């Protein structure tokens, strides 16, 4: 049974009807991890894995998956594991992967360390919220090699979730969601090197909900690529990152019904960018709402002549029905890079662009500019009218701060980047991702701790062995930076979705995908 699906923003009445679409249906796994584990549990230690940071985890993980791929839970207990051969876990159904240990890359092949493909009803998570993949990318980057392996990729996966996982220092991209559907990604921390090409999350899929993530790197924070439809991205903390984006966009672009909401961007390349250079196709029905930025180079940057990508054949990508609403904060230097830059193709001008409640101000100097080219709509430098002809760049310079630009900051804003030539410690997953917004789901470690404490109260019905298991689960809280996850007694099924953020409503999850039970099996 599925919960009734609805479109979040249309219910709230916050945006025009043309841009109200977000999710098109329910997301998440069809059955709970506890039900999968009850059917069968495949512990990688039983297939030859050793938590000694030397023995290759690849073959035992593949063997455990083969035993549980038709229904079950693959379990990687707490501890430190080396991984020198990559795994492609394909054609699974109704299975889960619980990573409570830390996986260290020791191999040097390209490709993807863990790739999940052609799979349905799937969940990937850490019950302690401290399971991690440590890519040790600095070993590549120190010699100027940026083409090493990616950490995690999902391809052709439906009805899934990925949560409570930490991805660190990938030699290349961290997490790609490729041609998937009905998925939820949440409660994650991604910490990469300070260089381009080390993307946080890239998604080109259908009906995906991405929320409550922190990303540190110097390229994509959470970026939508083509083709993509019905994607909701919210409560995102781009903490010294590249910033969120769409693109790069090329030929036959097909992106529609995308919402970014509650996006906090600190000391990054941009708050939001749509990037292309030539090409064809469309981007339509898009909402960028509730953005806070501080210290970023660019704020809103729509660039249809982006020089960092090679020109693609075509008149350009058509952008239409785009709403930019409730942006506040500051940019690094508004005289150098103004807070609004909308540069559209001359042969296919942008239209129906709406900018409202936009108040940004410069941190350096006393003036800033807004710039538009071949762009139509309402607000700032946009031209009005229904006859959309090309026009040259128009720039408006202002020397007084707009009212209401002041915005909150996050207490965890980083003061220094991670560099790219030294080891990056494993962070903890934060419990806040946007000022004033409560995450939709509590961390697994918090849920497990509460459940274990509740179980420990009733000692009259609990055996000494069970009490020991409860105590171990209580210890499964996030660890200090750089430490390994604690040992646990066994797999802990994922569980109850947490509180709804203030003023928001929860998009539909599959009924059985997130009923977390908390205690050990």
UniProtKB/Swiss-Prot annotation:
Catalytic activity of the protein: Endohydrolysis of alpha-D-GalA-(1->2)-alpha-L-Rha glycosidic bond in the rhamnogalacturonan I backbone with initial inversion of anomeric configuration releasing oligosaccharides with beta-D-GalA at the reducing end
Molecular function terms, GO-annotated: polygalacturonase activity; rhamnogalacturonan alpha-L-rhamnopyranosyl-(1->4)-alpha-D-galactopyranosyluronide lyase activity
GO biological process, one term: cell wall organization
Bridged cysteine pairs (disulfide): 42-68, 221-238, 344-350, 372-381
Segment forming the signal sequence: 1-21
Matches recorded under Pfam families: Glyco_hydro_28, Pect-lyase_RHGA_epim
Biased amino acid composition, Basic residues: 507-521
Predominant localisation class: secreted
The UniProt record lists the keyword Aminoacyl-tRNA synthetase: no
Glycosylated residues, chain numbering: 145, 239, 321
Top enzyme class: hydrolase
Keywords (A to Z) from UniProt: Carbohydrate metabolism, Cell wall biogenesis/degradation, Disulfide bond, Glycoprotein, Glycosidase, Hydrolase, Polysaccharide degradation, Secreted, Signal
Biased composition annotated in UniProt, kind: Polar residues: 469-486
Entry EC number(s): 3.2.1.171
Assigned GO CC terms: extracellular region
Keyword Cell wall biogenesis/degradation: yes
Family to which the UniProt record says this protein belongs: Belongs to the glycosyl hydrolase 28 family.
Protein purpose: Pectinolytic enzymes consist of four classes of enzymes: pectine lyase, polygalacturonase, pectin methylesterase and rhamnogalacturonase. Hydrolyzes alpha-D-galacturonopyranosyl-(1,2)-alpha-L-rhamnopyranosyl linkages in the backbone of the hairy regions of pectins.
Name this protein carries in UniProt: Probable rhamnogalacturonase B
Organism: Aspergillus fumigatus (strain ATCC MYA-4609 / CBS 101355 / FGSC A1100 / Af293)
């Amino acid at each position: 049974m599925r919960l009734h699906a609805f479109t979040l923003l249309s219910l709230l009445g916050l945006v025009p009807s043309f841009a109200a679409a977000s999710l098109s249906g329910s997301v998440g796994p069809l059955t709970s991890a506890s039900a999968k584990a009850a059917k069968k549990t495949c512990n990688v230690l039983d297939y030859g894995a050793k938590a000694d940071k030397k023995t290759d985890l690849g073959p035992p993980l593949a063997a455990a998956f083969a035993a549980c791929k038709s229904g079950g839970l693959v379990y990687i207990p707490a501890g430190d594991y080396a991984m020198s051969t990559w795994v492609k876990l394909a054609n699974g159904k109704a299975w889960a992967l619980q990573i409570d240990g830390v996986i260290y890359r020791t191999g040097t092949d390209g490709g993807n360390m863990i790739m999940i493909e052609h799979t349905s009803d799937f969940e990937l998570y850490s019950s302690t919220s401290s399971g991690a993949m440590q890519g040790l990318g600095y070993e590549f980057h120190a010699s100027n090699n940026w083409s090493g392996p990616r950490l995690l990729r999902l391809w052709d996966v439906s009805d899934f979730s990925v949560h409570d996982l930490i991805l660190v220092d990938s030699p290349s991209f961290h997490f790609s969601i490729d041609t998937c559907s009905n998925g939820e990604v949440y409660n994650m921390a991604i910490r990469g090197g300070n260089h381009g090409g080390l993307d946080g999350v890239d998604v080109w899929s259908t009906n995906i909900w991405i929320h409550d993530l922190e990303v540190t790197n110097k390229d994509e924070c959470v970026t939508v690529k083509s083709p993509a439809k019905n994607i909701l991205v919210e409560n995102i903390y781009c903490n010294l990152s590249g910033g969120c984006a769409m693109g790069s966009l090329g030929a036959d672009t097909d992106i529609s019904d995308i919402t970014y909401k509650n996006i906090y961007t600190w000391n990054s390349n941009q708050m939001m960018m749509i990037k292309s250079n030539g090409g064809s196709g469309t981007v339509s029905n898009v909402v960028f709402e509730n953005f806070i930025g501080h210290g970023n180079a660019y704020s809103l940057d729509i660039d249809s002549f982006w020089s960092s990508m090679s020109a693609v054949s075509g008149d350009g990508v058509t952008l239409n029905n785009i709403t930019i609403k409730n942006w506040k904060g500051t940019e690094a230097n508004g005289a150098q890079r103004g807070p609004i830059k909308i540069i559209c193709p001359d042969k296919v001008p942008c239209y129906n662009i709406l900018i409202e409640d936009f108040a940004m101000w410069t941190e350096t100097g006393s003036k800033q500019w807004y710039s538009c080219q071949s762009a139509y709509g309402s607000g700032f430098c946009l031209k009005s009218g229904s006859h959309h002809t090309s026009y040259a760049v128009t720039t408006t310079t202002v020397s007084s701060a707009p009212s209401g630009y002041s915005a909150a900051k996050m207490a965890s804003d980083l003061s220094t980047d991670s560099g790219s030539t030294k080891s990056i410690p494993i962070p903890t997953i934060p419990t806040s991702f946007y000022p004033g917004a409560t995450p939709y789901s509590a961390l697994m470690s918090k849920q497990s701790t509460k459940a274990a404490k509740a179980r420990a109260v009733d000692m009259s019905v609990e055996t000494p062995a069970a009490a020991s298991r409860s105590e171990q689960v209580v210890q499964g809280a996030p660890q200090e930076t750089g430490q390994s996850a604690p040992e646990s007694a066994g797999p802990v099924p994922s569980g109850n979705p947490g509180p709804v953020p203030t003023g928001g409503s929860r998009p539909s999850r599959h009924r059985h995908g997130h009923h977390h039970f908390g205690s050990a099996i």
